[in-house]
Amino acid sequence: MAELKITQVRSTIGARWKQRESLRTLGLKKIRQSVVREDNAQTRGLINTVHHLVEVEEVGK
């Protein structure tokens, strides 16, 4: 299964509570922090919630 590299590029100042919690669930706390997550429906849903705060790129295994 493919993996996604998710990088936070914008601050959570002014973001809604649900967006902050989605970033926390993804494991992102600071700007320019990156995590690699499995590409599944749950991860895609979290990314969809915060698409304006993160950059996503596919990582080959």
From Swiss-Prot:
This is Large ribosomal subunit protein uL30. GO terms for biological process: translation. Belongs to the universal ribosomal protein uL30 family. Pfam families: Ribosomal_L30. GO terms for molecular function: structural constituent of ribosome. Keywords: Ribonucleoprotein, Ribosomal protein. Disulfide bonds: none annotated. The gene is rpmD. Part of the 50S ribosomal subunit. It comes from Mycolicibacterium smegmatis (strain ATCC 700084 / mc(2)155) (Mycobacterium smegmatis). GO terms for cellular component: cytosolic large ribosomal subunit.
